[in-house]
């Protein structure tokens, strides 16, 4: 059976400078949608690219002493490298300087002139060079550009005009007959009230004051207005107007144009009218999302608040960034990036909720069943039943949210399942069940439910996180492709009996919030990594000791075999440790940071020759190493293959 198609586009980016995290936001969102649709079995066409013509580009190139083509070639290479680092799974990258695009734009313009939709006249009015936009006097805000707030220039020149007014009634009728065409709804009201109702004037679609652009056929002193040029990319990339237009016939009209709210006007007024004039179907939806802002407003170099996505990826990993962008901000609204919020999302959502759930599940399956996942035989208890029902309900919520492009809602649903699974461990207490042979079958059911819940989680995370789901599948021992597909979510309990788990590295190590916030802020300001802050912290150094003093400390590798809470001591945990044939009990003040069950199987470092001491009525026969500052905290651990009792030198 032939697959359904899904055509999704991002705006094509203007390569006048290095892209920041706000630009990455749109493309990551589009990538998540493209991956989701592929997961659902669609034949997806995901398009992105660059808008490389215009007066601003020409001026920037002149400032640098290079040709406009050299200027854009250099920046476009950086954009493509950024998309590679972000794992953007685009199917085509269109450049408006490519011949495949320019030839068709010339044909489109010539056709519109021939049929009388474009005519030659004279333009006198206001022009914003950064936005490449024309405005009437009444559209200006305090004399400045209504979109970016910068000063505008008064221009008077011969120009070709597009008869926008001819199509206004048809456009409003399309809005009425297709209520979901502009999303969110507030954007539609803005277009009608601010641009159409006041009277849509004919649009100047050529310039004569610069020459970096596609020339008007038969009148080369005119350059085609950059937005007419740029908007056509959505069909030129598909081969429209060529002998090889198979993709155009297959994918057009677009299912979704993803754009920032500042360019909704071009995509919901100029573009539909242009398509009407060409006799082509209109896109099904234009989604104008909000901006990713900083606390002090939009990102700008002058404010020193630009966040480089490459820096974030290199230090924290790609999935941490992708998760934050799509979880933190409701898509369609403005959102604020804060270093504190970013690090907290990593620590709480990714390291604690997800990472620890996987770690303790794998550790318990190894400990209680030799690493083999027990068979799923249906729910044994109300807790089992509730977990499996939650998983199915989360899939329903997730699907509804994704179809509405509510990415944060979809991720919230996944974390609802993760939270329910963590609670399930507390409810079933597998470490207690393991003490009674009569509870063996119930314990097996708990392990099977935990593994299956994590499999559901990994499947649902695939559109958002490009590396982590496969790491989860690997630790669960799942290699069968069918268990990673959407259709596998229709049945709970598909992991084959005896599938062997493989303990791996933590998905997301905990971070020191104070240090990492300083690091990000230093880079936002164009400074070096937060070495200065680290040096200040290290200034008050501890008293120096000799190597002989240090040699007196006996540090050994120990495995946590039985952790439990201390009665009447909120901050203390009682840990039974295996030091390689020797058992020790250690009381540790880590209860604020770790749940007992997530410590099972961890290889920690124990001070083995510390004099025993009594704490809250219990003997502590050593100390385990841990550390942190600024709100972050982590145990010192070693690789799993290091034998218990190994001396640390």
Swiss-Prot record:
It comes from the Bacteria. Zn(2+) binds at residues 128, 131, 145, 148. ATP binds at residue 301. It comes from Geobacillus stearothermophilus (Bacillus stearothermophilus). This is Methionine--tRNA ligase. One of its GO terms (cellular component) is cytoplasm. Residues 555-647 form the tRNA-binding domain. It is found in: Cytoplasm. Its main location: cytoplasm. The keyword Aminoacyl-tRNA synthetase applies. Binds 1 zinc ion per subunit. A motif ('KMSKS' region) lies at residues 298-302. Homodimer. One of its GO terms (biological process) is methionyl-tRNA aminoacylation. Belongs to the class-I aminoacyl-tRNA synthetase family. MetG type 2A subfamily. HAMAP family: Met_tRNA_synth_type2 (MF_01228). PROSITE patterns: AA_TRNA_LIGASE_I, TRBD. The keyword NADP does not apply. Pfam families: Anticodon_3, tRNA-synt_1g, tRNA_bind. Its EC number is 6.1.1.10. A motif ('HIGH' region) lies at residues 13-23. It catalyses: tRNA(Met) + L-methionine + ATP = L-methionyl-tRNA(Met) + AMP + diphosphate. Keywords: Aminoacyl-tRNA synthetase, ATP-binding, Cytoplasm, Ligase, Metal-binding, Nucleotide-binding, Protein biosynthesis, RNA-binding, tRNA-binding, Zinc. GO terms for molecular function: ATP binding; metal ion binding; methionine-tRNA ligase activity; tRNA binding. CDD domains: Anticodon_Ia_Met, MetRS_core, tRNA_bind_EcMetRS_like.
